[in-house]
Amino acid sequence: MSKNIYVKETYEWIRVGNGENELTEIEYEKLLKYLEKNNDVLKSNIIDIKYKKLRFINYVGIICFENVILEILPKLSLSDNLVKDREILLQMLSICNKIPITMNEKIRLSLKNYNLLNFFVMYFIESMQTQMKKGIYFEYINKIENLNVMRGKILLSTYAKEKGISPMKIRCKYDEYSENNFLNQVLKKACISILCRINDNSIQGKIKKILSYFQNVDLIYIDRKKLLDYKFYKNNDRFKDCYLLARLLLLNLSMDNSQNNQEAFSILFEINTLYEEYIGILIKSIWDNSFRETYIQDKSKFLLKNEQTGKKNFNLRPDIVLYDLKNEYEIIIDTKWKAIEVDSNVFYRSSDIYQMYAYITAYENAKRCILLYPCIQKDKNYSSWKLSESFKGKFIDCLLYTSPSPRDRG
């Protein structure tokens, strides 16, 4: 039986001990070994290590090793509700098109019973079951073989060059309507990977039943580029959700190992980037109309102009710029995935304020520059600064974003 540990990114430490939410000495060393081994994939500042404890910085998701499933969640709810934080994280991933999942009541209820890994796997299984009832996917596969009878097109030029071919054989090129295609090979590989890694009798039973449909599909090494570049059309579109979930699992579970014998694996998302993208999509959906536009990572402005060369230097790139073309003004928003307040002490980084000052002075029509932090405490107001008279009517504000429940978003 798996051991489940839940922690909040940045806010909670994983400790060595015998408690319910603690790691043994052996488990702790296994985790450190995995993180060290994957240091080229994960950014170096992912962990903060102290004596017999560590915490994760800027990454959320799951890490599985030995019999441990470690779930790292962002602190998004004001009530410290694990299920709600998990729910809002999935909503963020869904809106940002990181996962092919649309939140509904059935999914919300399942989050009470499943960690993130089992949730992804169960959603994949249910999607596969739905499509398998309609039948496995077939497509025409281009094949070249030496045959006893003519089929398709005869390849005389290649036949003449090859040695050792029986004179009774014919070199043919033809199309075969087959289930042994790349899409099915990916789905089968994902099922095998799940079977090797998820120690749950119910899940294993369902996966084995799905695999019975793929007996004539080869188990192959899946090329990463080919996996990422696969296209969908009218005939294969019904398998899109299944494929995208299989891709998510394969990219993290087994892409570097065709023998399925990894000791550990992870599915992690960089929360700072995810938060920025999520806020951008939400604001764009509210702000944009016929005379208002939202620009993400706008690169139109520079801080300085070089007197010798005449070239502009030091490109500014605010996270979000809101343009009002009718009233000719701009609002600049920079998202910050960090706590503005720790132990009742408010911390404004001077570098952040200087950055906002550079933005609001470079954008001539900018009225407000907003530092947007996640809200972790109710009913709090933070500073607003007015610029000097030479920049009349310009303000820098610190505001908080409170994540609504996905129910509130419909």
How would you label these PLM feature ranges?
Residues 336-337, 344-351, 357-390:
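Nucleic-acid nuclease catalytic cores
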Residues 401-410:
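Conserved small/polar residues in nucleotide/adenosyl-binding loops
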Residues 268-270, 303-312, 338-351:
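Short, contiguous acidic/charged loop-to-helix segments that flank catalytic cores in large enzymes
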Residues 17-43, 268-301:
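Acidic-basic catalytic patches of nuclease active cores, encompassing PD-(D/E)XK
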Residues 22, 30, 41-257:
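Residue(s) in the substrate-gating loop at a strand-loop-helix junction
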Residues 65-69, 321-332:
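Active-site beta-strand-loop-beta-strand hairpin of nuclease catalytic cores
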Residues 251-266, 275-281:
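Extended, gly/pro-poor, charged amphipathic helical "stalk/hinge" elements that serve as dimerization
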Residues 45-61, 294-327:
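Active-site metal-binding core of divalent-cation-utilizing nuclease and nuclease-like domains
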